[in-house]
Amino acid sequence: MTEHNVRNFNINFGPQHPAAHGVLRLVLELDGEIVERVDPHIGLLHRGTEKLIEAKTYLQAIPYFDRLDYVAPMNQEHAFALAVERLTGTQVPIRGQLIRVLYSEIGRILSHLLNVTTQAMDVGALTPPLWGFEEREKLMVFYERACGARMHAAYFRPGGVHQDLPHQLVEDIGNWIDPFLKTVDDIDELLTGNRIFKQRNVDIGVVSLEDAWAWGFSGVMVRGSGAAWDLRRSQPYECYSDLEFDIPIGKNGDCFDRYLIRMIEMRQSARIMRQCVDRLLGDAKIGPVSSLDGKIVPPKRGEMKRSMEALIHHFKLYTEGYHVPAGEVYAAVEAPKGEFGVYLVSDGTNKPYRCKIRAPGYAHLQAMDFLCRGHQLADVSAVLGSLDIVFGEVDR
């Protein structure tokens, strides 16, 4: 009988692969169809964001955050704005807080819709992406009507938001919620009980809670493993402590649980949006949307036409920028993908001394090897989809 030497087979997954979600390159070591080792190669979208921010004023740094997780841009600006507000001791008026929360939840729905529907597409269901992108298009229009940009908004500024929302826009967002919940039910009906979708996701990429903490997971990745850890509830910021919403948790920690959690979170986000819309049309119908302290937020156009001092303030804020007191602060928000944190070090000048960005996707991607070992090659794209990776924030 002849002896056969069996050696493992190496293949490249990406960077041009449609299921690689951007510019991911995985080097996979396969034993037949079984994955023995996964080696993610990142950095193909590295732009040196953290270094670039050090050469910009605090206001000029905001657009960099839109370009990290470009699926839900405003959630990242939120963390940076919170960090600057904590260092400067700025208070955001309630109408500004409600608008921020409203648009953060729109961002969460944008991200989850993209993730749930493209994950369905990765395992072969082609209808959900078409339905999901129809709703995302409407949300993009709400972004555009608030600030003029569909994606890179630069709308959340330290001190509040850039400009007020028209009443008609708030009403339109309120009218959008119920038809959207119907769409979520349709996607739910198509996928949740679907035999093929279940076979591709149940018991794939299982993470125990201990492993989730050890790998530095956050967001849906820990909630899928059974911990009710959500920064909106555990470390409330803005007016989340006044709003009612539930935190869904899974019990198996597999791809299917994470999918179910994202579906429920979209419904909870719609519930939060409903509360914000009611208050923006009710007790917070009129009022300032950004801090009235003129040292950070530029004066209104009308004031500039009347007062020389306002004009000087405006000129100084947009040329030199404001000086932030020396100190360091960590501000984190519950972004759609997990805990998005900004560690900001100020040396008292008009530019950040250091701005460290803690992207959730980075911690999730490092566990690809741990998650995919022993699974089949076809499951790699299912695991990758359930991690919800966007390369802007991983490579930054």
Swiss-Prot record:
GO terms for cellular component: plasma membrane. It comes from Rhizobium meliloti (strain 1021). HAMAP family: NDH1_NuoD (MF_01358). InterPro entries: NADH_Q_OxRdtase_suD, NADH_UbQ_OxRdtase_49kDa_CS, NDH1_su_D/H, NiFe-Hase_large. One of its GO terms (molecular function) is NADH:ubiquinone reductase (non-electrogenic) activity. It is a peripheral membrane protein. It is an enzyme of class 7 (translocase). NDH-1 shuttles electrons from NADH, via FMN and iron-sulfur (Fe-S) centers, to quinones in the respiratory chain. The immediate electron acceptor for the enzyme in this species is believed to be ubiquinone. Couples the redox reaction to proton translocation (for every two electrons transferred, four hydrogen ions are translocated across the cytoplasmic membrane), and thus conserves the redox energy in a proton gradient. Belongs to the complex I 49 kDa subunit family. NCBIfam families: NuoD, PRK06075.1. Its EC number is 7.1.1.-. NDH-1 is composed of 14 different subunits. Subunits NuoB, C, D, E, F, and G constitute the peripheral sector of the complex. Gene3D superfamilies: Cytochrome-c3 Hydrogenase, chain B. This is NADH-quinone oxidoreductase subunit D 1. It is found in: Cell inner membrane. Keywords: Cell inner membrane, Cell membrane, Membrane, NAD, Quinone, Translocase, Transport, Ubiquinone. It catalyses: a quinone + NADH + 5 H(+)(in) = a quinol + NAD(+) + 4 H(+)(out).
